[in-house]
Design a protein with these regions (language model features):
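Short glycine-/small-residue-rich flexible loop motifs, especially phosphate/cofactor-binding loops
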Residues: 34, 53, 196, 223, ...
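Glycine- and Gly-Pro-enriched alpha-helical subdomains that act as flexible
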Residues: 160-216
Length: 272
């Protein structure tokens, strides 16, 4: 699995600095493969992800979508053998056995292919989210000195980004800024689901004493996932969308964007 997180290709690099310079050499590219998640023999979703921590990804996705509430809701998660005509296991098909067979209404399930850019976007409203959220979002004052250090701490743990330059990261940090878990994926939504899935598997939800840090922009979808997991603060290195800001304010979540160096934007919440 580790070898599939990235691939090596012959790449022609072109520079125009001091005249045209062309150099062909081996370069590392972030891995991207489909992961189909099934339950009861039916497909829940297919997401384009970077292989690795797929069990966490599946648990995090199901929790973020409101399909499971705790680890006990899943009895088994396993890769499907015989995924090709030759009987090979591609590790791209994951079967999830649920404790309650009727926890998902498969007849009404939104079957989607989730790309690595935006995931399942725009399918929920703020009102629906506030009704669906299981946890009370904690009020966490934003400590500017802690927040300012979080992006660099996240970047320091991005091993695949250092190799490829093309992969997102999500991390759960303590309120003092110490890392609890960091995951990487070509899709920011997958990286967040992997973190949430890890916390679920470790019985660490709700994450009301943790901060979710993203190496991306802050979209509605990421605020949604953070709220479903009980985070009281989301920190992103890039901009926040209008719906993300509105959702954070409605749920009471602190939302930080453009966290770079010694500055950031506070879209929702208050300073400590």
């Amino acid at each position: 699995m580790a070898g599939r997180k990235n691939s090596t290709f012959a790449v022609t690099k072109v520079r125009l600095g001091n005249g045209l310079q062309v150099d062909t050499r081996a370069d590392t590219v972030a891995g991207e493969e489909p992961l189909e998640i099934r339950t009861g023999g039916q497909t829940i979703t297919t997401t384009m992800r970077t292989p690795g921590h797929d069990i966490e990804l599946a648990h995090g996705f199901l929790h973020s979508e409101g399909h499971i509430a705790s680890l006990s809701d899943v009895t088994e998660a396993r890769y499907c053998a015989g995924a090709t005509v030759n009987g090979m296991n591609t590790y791209n098909l994951l079967d999830i056995d649920l404790a309650k067979k009727n926890v998902l209404d498969l007849s009404d399930l939104r079957l989607t292919t989730t790309n690595s850019a935006c995931g399942v976007c725009g399918t929920s409203s703020i009102e629906a989210l506030t009704k669906q959220t299981r946890y009370q979002i904690p009020h966490i004052p934003v400590d500017p000195y802690v927040v300012a250090k979080l992006p660099d701490k996240l970047r320091a743990e991005q091993k695949q980004f250092k190799k490829t330059g093309g992969i997102h990261a999500a991390g759960a940090f303590t309120l003092d800024g110490e890392p609890v878990v960091i995951r990487e994926d070509i899709g920011r939504h997958n990286a967040a689901d992997k973190v949430i899935g890890h916390l679920l598997l470790e019985d660490r939800l709700p994450a009301d004493d943790l901060i979710l840090v993203m190496s991306s922009r802050a979209s509605f979808e990421l605020v949604q996932k953070a709220a479903m997991a009980g985070f009281g603060m989301l920190v992103a290195v890039s901009a926040a969308s209008s719906l993300a800001v509105e959702t954070a304010r409605e749920t009471g979540m602190a939302l930080v964007g453009f966290a770079r160096g010694d500055r950031f934007n506070l879209y929702s919440g208050e300073l400590a």
